């Protein structure tokens, strides 16, 4: 007998402004097809002014309405604020990227940190044996990274930023194992670190990045970048040229999608090489 989840059309979405760049529909459509689920996952462009109305309509729960979806830039903070039940992860970050209706209430979580560490687990197993990590950048994208590293019990998380005040705010937010430094201290801070994470936009869409010397990192260190366009960012290229292991940022996008799919469609999807190749092919077209 068919699973009852598969006899009804289940609808989910990704909402952002703009949204045409989103590759989330490719990811979820791949999984829907793989499981043979009668469902849809569509990109919806909604301006910040119209977002509260969008959420209010979702909460009405009319027949055929979406069961939930992803919120991306610039709606993550608003998705958290408008949720009836944000979980502890979203609460601490002040942002949600995954929302769903349950018993008439809107629930919210943030899966960015899960995506980040799952990518490292897949592409560089054992990375979390390090006791010292360097997070380069203190913007919004760094929060989930810092949270996930702390929750994986990395002993020291050093946040380096051009304006040290931003880094200090994150150290205050995420606790005593997080330390703040100005960009001038980067080389010194890297000494003995087993993980270097770029959370800045340096190298995004082919822009140049300043030269970084990774020679002070630990012998078995890994450098990763949450930027995935281009796949091999200037920072990853620099690390490879210096003989350092690297992990690109694409897996973070793929893995962060898994909890939402499970929540909306009731199946646990896998990130495989076919899916990865689909996204890379789409990146090469645009």
From Swiss-Prot:
Active site: 76 (proton acceptor)
EC number: 1.1.1.25
Positions bound to shikimate: 22-24, 72, 97, 112, 228
Domain of life (superkingdom): Bacteria
Chain positions recorded as NADP(+) binding sites: 137-141, 161-166, 226, 249
Catalytic activity as recorded in UniProt: shikimate + NADP(+) = 3-dehydroshikimate + NADPH + H(+)
Molecular function in Gene Ontology: NADP binding; shikimate 3-dehydrogenase (NADP+) activity
Record's GO cellular component terms: cytosol
InterPro entries the record matches: Aminoacid_DH-like_N_sf (IPR046346), NAD(P)-bd_dom_sf (IPR036291), SDH_C (IPR041121), Shikimate_DH (IPR011342), Shikimate_DH-bd_N (IPR013708), Shikimate_DH_fam (IPR022893), Shikm_DH/Glu-tRNA_Rdtase (IPR006151)
Leading EC class: oxidoreductase
Pathways per UniProt: Metabolic intermediate biosynthesis; chorismate biosynthesis; chorismate from D-erythrose 4-phosphate and phosphoenolpyruvate: step 4/7
Any Gene Ontology biological process: chorismate biosynthetic process
Record-annotated disulphide pairs: none
Tagged with keyword Amino-acid biosynthesis: yes
Subunit structure: Homodimer.
Family, as annotated: Belongs to the shikimate dehydrogenase family.
Record's function text: Involved in the biosynthesis of the chorismate, which leads to the biosynthesis of aromatic amino acids. Catalyzes the reversible NADPH linked reduction of 3-dehydroshikimate (DHSA) to yield shikimate (SA).
Protein name: Shikimate dehydrogenase (NADP(+))
Source organism of this protein record: Agrobacterium fabrum (strain C58 / ATCC 33970)
């Amino acid at each position: 007998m068919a699973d009852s989840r598969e006899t009804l059309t289940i609808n989910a979405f990704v909402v952002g402004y703009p949204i045409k760049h989103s590759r989330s529909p490719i990811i979820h459509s791949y999984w829907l097809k793989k499981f043979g689920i009668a469902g849809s996952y569509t990109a919806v462009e909604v301006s910040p002014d119209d977002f509260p109305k969008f959420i209010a309509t979702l909460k009405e729960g009319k027949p055929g309405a979406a069961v939930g979806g992803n919120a991306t830039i610039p709606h993550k903070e608003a998705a958290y604020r408008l949720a009836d039940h944000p979980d502890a992860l979203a609460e601490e970050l002040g942002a949600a990227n995954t929302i769903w209706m349950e018993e008439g209430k809107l629930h919210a979580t943030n899966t960015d940190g899960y995506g980040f560490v799952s990518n490292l687990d897949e592409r560089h197993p054992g990375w979390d044996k390090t006791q010292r990590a360097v997070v380069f950048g203190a913007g919004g994208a760094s929060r989930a990274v810092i949270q996930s590293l702390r929750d994986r019990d990395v002993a020291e998380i050093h946040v380096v930023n051009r304006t040290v005040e931003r880094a200090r705010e994150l150290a205050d937010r995420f606790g005593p194992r997080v330390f703040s430094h100005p960009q001038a201290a980067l080389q010194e801070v890297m000494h003995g670190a087993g993980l270097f994470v770029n959370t800045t936009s340096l190298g995004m869409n082919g822009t140049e990045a300043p030269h970084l010397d990774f020679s002070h990192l630990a012998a078995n260190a890994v450098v990763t970048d949450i930027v995935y366009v281009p796949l091999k960012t200037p920072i990853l290229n620099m690390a490879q040229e210096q003989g350092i292991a690297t992990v690109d940022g694409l897996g973070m996008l793929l893995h962060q999608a898994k909890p939402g799919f499970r929540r909306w469609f009731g199946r646990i999807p896998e990130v495989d090489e076919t899916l990865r190749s689909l996204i890379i092919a789409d990146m090469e077209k645009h």
